[in-house]
A protein has these predicted regions:
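An N-terminally biased module of ancient metal coordination in phosphate/nucleic-acid-related enzymes
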Residues: 1-88, 110, 189-191
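Alpha-helical scaffold elements within enzyme catalytic domains, especially in hydrolases
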Residues: 42-45, 69-70, 119, 126, ...
């Protein structure tokens, strides 16, 4: 069962856990409008309780950008992943490496989800469907007609870009199917970063390797920090 936290305001960071926004987009994505440094400035200005964020650019892996100077300047973990498009909706892939890039064409908008899951697992990456309650591009939109996909145990249950009803569907279906759940803002503009995030209790996650280990470990929970979230 997925435990979900909701809060009305942003509070100070709990030193006993890491809080990461696992789903963000920068200007590297074709529909992104946010510069990475501006995300950092916004987090600092608004004192958002985030220890870092993951850039999940659409249909690509941004191997060239180096954000270590920004990490040092702002005290944030800034990691890079990908959002790919499959025949069962969009999937986030953490821990992208050369072997995975050789096995899968990230630019393909109809990747077989089984291939994404299998190749990610084989190469040490971690793949999980995002915004599964969304029409057309969400995992659960395909389950009624096509059945349940084997090999999925984790999905994004809180998404900062969701409209009413989508996250509720994600949470309900995840509970029914026994899936673990995480959260991400799906921000494409600076002001939406941190709307949803993921808490990792008693863990220090400072790079992609430790993030992938934590995702496989399963000790995490989603949190909504939308301005209109209830207590």
């Amino acid at each position: 069962m997925t435990n979900v936290s909701l809060c009305r305001c942003f509070y100070s960071i709990d030193l006993n856990q890491m809080r990461l926004d696992l789903h963000t987009h920068s200007i590297k994505s074709d529909d992104g409008r946010a510069k990475v440094e501006n995300y950092c400035k916004w987090i600092q200005k608004k004192q958002l309780p985030l220890d870092g964020f993951v850039l999940t650019e659409h249909r690509q892996f941004d191997a060239d950008s180096d954000y270590r100077e920004l990490e040092d300047e702002y005290g944030l973990a800034i990691m890079k992943a990908s959002e790919v498009e499959t025949d069962f909706g969009h999937v986030l892939v953490f821990g992208v490496n050369e072997d995975l890039l050789a096995a899968i064409d990230f630019t393909d908008v109809r990747l077989p989800i089984e291939a994404v899951l299998d190749e990610s697992r084989k190469t040490g990456a971690f793949a999980a469907p995002c915004h599964p309650g969304r029409k057309r591009v969400g995992l659960f939109a395909h389950y009624e007609d096509r059945g349940v996909v084997d090999g999925i145990d984790t999905v994004e249950v809180l998404n900062g870009g969701s409209i009413p009803g989508e996250d509720e569907l994600s949470l309900n279906m995840a509970e029914q199917l026994g899936y673990r759940g995480f959260g991400g803002s799906d921000s494409h503009v600076v002001s939406r970063i941190g709307f949803c995030a993921t808490d990792f209790p008693n863990q220090q996650i400072l790079d992609m390797e430790t993030l992938v280990d934590a995702l496989y470990g399963g000790n995490f929970s989603p949190i909504s920090m939308r301005p209109d979230a209830g207590n």
